[in-house]
Amino acid sequence: MADAPTFNAQPCDIITQLVLGPVSPRVRNARQASADRWMEIETILHESTRHDGVAPFSEQFLRGMEEPDLNHWHALVRVDGHVRGIAAVDPSGPAVELAVHPSYRRGGLATALQRAVRAHASSLGLGDERDIHTNGIGLTWWAHGDLPPARAAAEHIGATADRELLVMELPGSVVKDESDNNPVAQAAATLPDDVTVLSWTESARRWGKDAVDAAWLAVNNEAFDWHPEQGGWDQARLDQARRASWYDPDGVLLLWGSEGDQKDGDTDSLPPLLGFHWTKLAREGDDETGRKVGEVYVIGLARKAQGRGLGRASTAKGIQYLASNDAAYVELYVEADNAPAVHAYEALGFTVVERHTAWKF
């Protein structure tokens, strides 16, 4: 722990550690935060969400606090002995997210956390700490909601906007509309007759889990060879993603082509996988009282399947699956500069509700 420096006349000190460990205060060891510290961290995240109208940490960073094998690194900033801010580094990006309690903002705590992250950069192989103030360190800082304080903090340290991610939402009135005039139903009806949609569970039962996973990974990596987070997956990365508490194999919809004999158990007759729609269904809040929220989590198409309207049809099929499982509404994330995708989602009834900015520093 460093001596207590002063940033903008607000005394604070920084604690850094490799892994916080499980959020539950009942499960602790030497590498994990104390129960009191966890309560303070959870308070920061809760109050930030309530104040800003958007959560400061994405799912990957929340998992990084619970799962040591993700190897996330954390810095905590304390004022008067209490944690008032947290920064997290995901080495796979590398990417950063941070949060400061709303009552302690504009006091230099975000700057203190950013300095701690900069000091950690050399251990990630991102350059010498003495040079990073002028040359940058190659980290991506995600500012959720693109709020003015975050934008000001980013500009203060010389960061530049690199990506913008839109959150789009389909209201419950559209999700639950079963009429033929529903744009979702109309899009689902365009699925070609020679394409069969099966869940991962159904597919694995027919052709074996290993063959299905291999086909899924091949399409994923072909579809996202350009993507910094979704591309280049292997079996270990897929297994890691499936450890999320909300994961349901029935919610992974796979689009199979018509070639090949589809006898049960005959893995040699695996037909070509044209694409997939990985849906997500979770609850708002931290308990079972919140509404179910559906998400168009990942959609990927093989190159040979592109240009056939399968993206639109598979999106609609996934929304129908989420609706059948009582989703109150459906959301998705899309790159702001992907105009064709944004227009396609708008045609289904989605509207933009949030903007998230990735800053390079």
Curated annotation (Swiss-Prot):
Acetyl-CoA 2 binds at residues 299-301, 306-312, 338-343. Gene3D superfamilies: 3.40.630.30. It comes from the Bacteria. It catalyses: 1D-myo-inositol 2-(L-cysteinylamino)-2-deoxy-alpha-D-glucopyranoside + acetyl-CoA = mycothiol + CoA + H(+). Coiled coil: none annotated. The lineage of its organism: Bacteria, Bacillati, Actinomycetota, Actinomycetes, Mycobacteriales. Belongs to the acetyltransferase family. MshD subfamily. 1D-myo-inositol 2-(L-cysteinylamino)-2-deoxy-alpha-D-glucopyranoside binds at E59, E229, K280, E295, Y333. Its EC number is 2.3.1.189. The keyword S-adenosyl-L-methionine does not apply. GO terms for molecular function: mycothiol synthase activity; protein-N-terminal-alanine acetyltransferase activity. Acetyl-CoA 1 binds at L98, A99, V100. The gene is mshD. This is Mycothiol acetyltransferase. It comes from Corynebacterium kroppenstedtii (strain DSM 44385 / JCM 11950 / CIP 105744 / CCUG 35717). CDD domains: NAT_SF (cd04301). Monomer. One of its GO terms (biological process) is mycothiol biosynthetic process. Keywords: Acyltransferase, Repeat, Transferase. Residues 25-173, 195-361 form the N-acetyltransferase domain. Catalyzes the transfer of acetyl from acetyl-CoA to desacetylmycothiol (Cys-GlcN-Ins) to form mycothiol. Pfam families: Acetyltransf_1.
